[in-house]
Each structure stands twice: as C-alpha cells, then as structure tokens.
C-alpha cells in the first residue's frame, strides 16, 4: 500500500491537496489477501483508514473490493461484509472476480460459483450505497471548495462529492 503516514500528514496539513484517498482494500480477510499476494493485512488497512478519518473527518476514503476470489469462503465473505459495514470508508467500487488468462488466480482451486459471486457483489454494493449515504449525510451543512463542471450546475468537492448548484449560485 503506497499511502504512508507521511502522506496522510501532508494531505492533512497542506491546503493544496484535496482530502480524497483511494486505497485498494481488495478484501478484508487476511487469508484472501494472502492468496491475492497483497503485501498488507486488514489490520494495517484499518489503522490507516482510521488515522485518515481521525485527522480529516471530512475526507473521502474510497476503495476497491473483489468478491468471489478463488478460495473465498462464506466466512471470508462475512469478514469482508462485516468490516465494510463498520469501516470509515465513504465509497467502494465492487468487482466480481473473473478469470483472466495467464494470471496465477486463474489456475487456483476453489472457484466460487458465478451465482454466488453475483449475489455477494450485490450485497457489497448495497453496503457501499449505505456507506456513501452515511458519508453524504455527515457532510450536510458543511462548506467545501468545489470545481464546477459543464454549465456550472454541477460540481465536485475536494472530498469527491458531486453536488448540484442552484442557478445563479456558481
């Protein structure tokens, strides 16, 4: 993971940086992370995201998650869902695992049936929607700098929220 405490400190203290982080969780089960050959643990990821949230309460923290990786058990999936529900993440991108020719994962045993992968992806997307709604609600009433888009009726804040701007207010 290429986000160090020094980077968190820099973003927290320098106003030229947008308070938006995108960190590749991939999974919350250490067994699955090991199978994916990820060089970090869920404990490291949790500590990093909690550090960001404590330093920058309004920061956006997004992540990518893969469901259905070969060998992902029901317990592994429950670990992922449970972590996400209580995580400080503001949004997630969910990817159902699919074989890619020539990759180590494509030759692994323990393939998860497609219907199960699709159901797990739906469940995690639902959790992701709840995370986004919680983050948006936490931003209600706050003021942020934003970059207007197109005709000025839409904008993106530094913490990655898309907002509508009333006519004449841009």
Model-predicted regions and their roles:
Residues 1-91, 102-116:
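Conserved non-cysteine loop/helix-boundary elements of the Radical SAM core domain that shape
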Residues 107-170:
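Terminal RNA-binding accessory module
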Residues 19-21, 59, 90-93, 142-144, ...:
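Structural beta-strand/beta-sheet cores of well-ordered domains, especially the beta-sheet scaffolds
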Residues 96-101, 136-137:
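AMP-binding (ANL) adenylation modules
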Residues 24-26, 62-64, 95-97, 149, ...:
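Generic beta-strand/beta-sheet core signal
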